[in-house]
Structures are given as structure tokens and as C-alpha cells.
């Protein structure tokens, strides 16, 4: 039974799902705004917020945790430099999800997820 399990499966095996989440999180932190499906946007919100919280903490252990998840080493460096000052007064809620039009090919619900 999967009662109280929070991670959406996104119709993928665990290894593919983890790689997708890492790639989407990396892209969001690099670009600041990406367009994806609504389900994927909701799924990466938690990991993105966790990475920004780690950057605000700024310790060596937090940096190593971020390096283990985010693909780009330079992105981690810039995140740890910019996030503490950018999100100093914000205790959470670093992302915003905006719904957009359905995808033409299959009618999937699309959304734009962006950093606040």
C-alpha cells in the first residue's frame, strides 16, 4: 500500500524519476523560470525549496548535499553566493507555479514554475 506517500511517480521508474527531478531542479535554478507539466512542477517545488534553504544555511555540509543533487558545480557556487542575500527575509515559498494553456499534442496541463 502506498498510503501517505508524498512523491508522485510521474509514470516513471525510480531511477528515471530521480534523474528527471535533478535535471528539472537544476534547470529551474539556472534559468529562474521553466515551463513543464503541472505535475512535474509540483513535484520539483519541494526539492528546489530544499536546495535554496541549504544555500541559505551556507555550511560546508549543506554545500556538499547540494553538490550531490544539482548537476552543475558552478551553479551550486553561484546559488550559495546569491541565495542568502536574495531570500534573507523570506522563510520559505521561494517558488511560484502559474498554470498555462494545455499542451496541444496530448492535452496535458502545463505550468510555469519560477523563482520568486
Swiss-Prot record:
GO terms for cellular component: cytosolic large ribosomal subunit. Belongs to the bacterial ribosomal protein bL17 family. GO terms for biological process: translation. Pfam families: Ribosomal_L17. GO terms for molecular function: structural constituent of ribosome. The keyword Nucleotidyltransferase does not apply. It comes from Synechococcus sp. (strain JA-2-3B'a(2-13)) (Cyanobacteria bacterium Yellowstone B-Prime). Keywords: Ribonucleoprotein, Ribosomal protein. HAMAP family: Ribosomal_bL17 (MF_01368). This is Large ribosomal subunit protein bL17. PROSITE patterns: RIBOSOMAL_L17 (PS01167). It comes from the Bacteria. Part of the 50S ribosomal subunit. Contacts protein L32.
Amino acid at each position: 500500500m502506498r498510503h501517505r506517500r508524498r512523491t508522485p511517480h510521474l509514470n516513471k521508474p525510480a531511477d528515471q524519476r530521480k534523474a528527471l527531478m535533478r535535471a528539472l531542479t537544476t534547470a529551474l535554478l539556472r534559468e529562474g523560470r521553466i515551463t513543464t507539466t503541472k505535475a512535474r512542477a509540483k513535484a520539483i517545488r519541494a526539492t528546489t525549496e530544499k536546495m535554496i534553504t541549504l544555500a541559505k544555511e551556507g555550511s560546508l555540509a549543506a554545500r556538499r548535499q547540494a553538490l550531490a543533487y544539482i548537476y552543475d558545480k558552478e551553479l551550486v557556487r553561484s546559488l550559495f553566493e546569491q541565495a542568502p542575500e536574495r531570500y534573507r527575509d523570506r522563510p520559505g515559498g521561494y517558488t511560484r507555479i502559474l498554470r498555462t494553456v494545455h499542451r496541444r499534442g496530448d492535452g496535458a496541463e502545463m505550468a510555469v514554475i519560477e523563482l520568486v
